[in-house]
Amino acid sequence: TPDEGDWSARRNAAMQVWREWLPVGEQPWKTYEFGDLGTYFRTDTRMIARSKPYWAGDLMRAPDPAKAFADFRDGAWMDPASTMFGTEQESWLFHQFARNKATWTVLGTGTNMGYNYTPEEALNWFSPETPDYRKNFMRQGIAAAKAGLPYNFDNWGGYPVARSRVFKAAQKNDLNLVVVSGDSH
């Protein structure tokens, strides 16, 4: 949000802290091989090159939110140019997939790859004292689900074509893929 300060400054500070406190080095993505048992791919889906995410709140403010969600689902949501990794990292990953011969392939991403949908009854989960902004967030998720969309476009749920490319690359190379991810709250 605008009151949190300049995005670039916050991102740069976060990246500096990440590198100073975690033993990951300067590389934003990397391969770790464990003999023929497994290969782990550490990727970046937050800071480097992903496409700008869409926000359900913007669609809710449209004159006809249901139409806005449907138009988004049938249009921008399916944009083949949309990416979580960026072209360079995605190319690197798919090349690594092609050369990987390990029994297990573990892909680490900063955001969930599974889709999450908000059920209509979710509004009943709140107490009467719950602030409206929280209820409105839930309404956004419900509106998205009614259009067949996941509630969060800021994770892989907002990048279905890019997500499909990852899974197709794993299938093409007959990998036993396990995805581990974070940032679920």
What are these regions (language model features)?
Residues 1-185:
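Metal-dependent phosphoester/phosphodiester hydrolase catalytic core
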